């Protein structure tokens, strides 16, 4: 009798193990199999462990499926919005060589090859009182800039471009408002000045890839931009010929700064690192272009802006309005 009782106990334990190791065709069957040894008085730990493992796996798969469904729903919603407004973003732009275009801030047809053959030595000799005021105003601004940045031309270029991008936007905005008020065209000068502002902004986006401004330099940018925007706005309202002359002299100083930048690059004082990808695409530079190539094309852009603003000032000095002379649209 005692041997039968011992055998029954052994069979119960063996049965618990067999119930756990038997393959279940569904999670419900597995759960039932895990529960039997516990009800029969056997060890329940293996069955519970298996149930928990399968439960965790099931939860993970459910969460993954839910995320996939949410992502799919968002994609469908975006497509619906684009289709509703008629603005399709699915078409990918490509370069001339067929590779994908990765920039959203400018398009392939907005790129160009800079004209580096432009005369960099041109200078407008100040003759009138307003010209002299404009000239010495710019010269006075150069002195504190030299002290603050010294030979750190990367950060100096960053500061310069945050200022240089303001006049074109202010002038274009005021001409735009004037065109609306007077119901007259601008002779293309609105577009020319806004192109200048955009070009200067792209200079800034480029140098932000190679310069690492400190927090106080960023704070200085905010201060200088705020002061200069309002000052130039008032100056343009009072005297457009004076405002354009100031920008012409600012661009002459920019040419000088970038020339010094190039000298330090050639002397090895500044590392001639590879050109940022955004610069290679924007100016259509070769794939192996360097920082020196970038500074060279930026300097050429500044020379073109110098010519445009001195030209605009000369138009006003001759007693004409800008609309009377066709604007040099796309003059790079």
Curated annotation (Swiss-Prot):
The keyword Transmembrane helix applies. The chain crosses the membrane at residues 157-177, 219-239. Catalyzes the cyanide-resistant oxidation of ubiquinol and the reduction of molecular oxygen to water, but does not translocate protons and consequently is not linked to oxidative phosphorylation. May increase respiration when the cytochrome respiratory pathway is restricted, or in response to low temperatures. It is a multi-pass membrane protein. Belongs to the alternative oxidase family. Homodimer; disulfide-linked. It is found in: Mitochondrion inner membrane. Induction: Induced by cold. Induced by drought and salt stresses, heat shock, hydrogen peroxide and methyl viologen. Down-regulated under oxygen deprivation. Fe cation 2 binds at residues 200, 251, 302, 305. Its cofactor is Fe cation. Keywords: Disulfide bond, Electron transport, Iron, Membrane, Metal-binding, Mitochondrion, Mitochondrion inner membrane, Oxidoreductase, Respiratory chain, Transit peptide, Transmembrane, Transmembrane helix, Transport. Expressed in roots, leaf sheaths and leaf blades. Binds 2 iron ions per subunit. It comes from Oryza sativa subsp. japonica (Rice). This is Ubiquinol oxidase 1a, mitochondrial.
């Amino acid at each position: 009798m005692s041997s039968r009782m011992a055998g029954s106990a052994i069979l119960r334990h063996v049965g618990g193990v067999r119930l756990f190791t038997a393959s279940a065709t569904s999670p419900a069957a597995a759960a039932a199999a895990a529960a039997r040894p516990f009800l029969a008085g056997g060890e329940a730990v293996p069955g519970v462990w298996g149930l928990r493992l399968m439960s965790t796996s099931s939860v993970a798969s459910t969460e993954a499926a839910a995320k996939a469904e949410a992502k799919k729903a968002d994609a469908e919603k975006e497509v619906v919005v684009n289709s509703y407004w008629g603005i399709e973003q699915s078409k990918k732009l490509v370069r001339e060589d067929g590779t994908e275009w990765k920039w959203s801030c400018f398009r392939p047809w907005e790129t160009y090859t800079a004209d580096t053959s432009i005369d960099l030595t041109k200078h407008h000799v100040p003759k009138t009182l307003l010209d002299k005021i404009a000239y010495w105003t710019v010269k006075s601004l150069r002195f504190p800039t030299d002290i603050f940045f010294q030979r750190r031309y990367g950060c100096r270029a960053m500061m310069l471009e945050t200022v240089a991008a303001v006049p074109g936007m202010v002038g274009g905005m005021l001409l735009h408002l004037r065109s609306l008020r007077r119901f007259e065209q601008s002779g293309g000068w609105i577009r020319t000045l806004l192109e200048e502002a955009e070009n200067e902004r792209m200079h800034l986006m480029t140098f932000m890839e190679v310069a690492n401004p400190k927090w106080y330099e960023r704070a200085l940018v905010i201060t200088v931009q705020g002061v200069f925007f309002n000052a130039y706005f008032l100056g343009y309202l009072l005297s457009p010929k004076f405002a354009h002359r100031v920008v012409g002299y600012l661009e002459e100083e920019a040419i000088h700064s970038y020339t010094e930048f190039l000298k330090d690059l050639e002397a090895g004082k500044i590392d001639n690192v590879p050109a940022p990808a955004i610069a290679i695409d924007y100016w259509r530079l070769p794939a192996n272009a360097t920082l020196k190539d970038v500074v060279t094309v930026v300097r050429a852009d500044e020379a073109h802006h110098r010519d445009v603003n001195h030209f605009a000032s000369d138009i006003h000095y001759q007693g004409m309005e800008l609309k009377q002379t066709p604007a040099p649209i796309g003059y790079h």
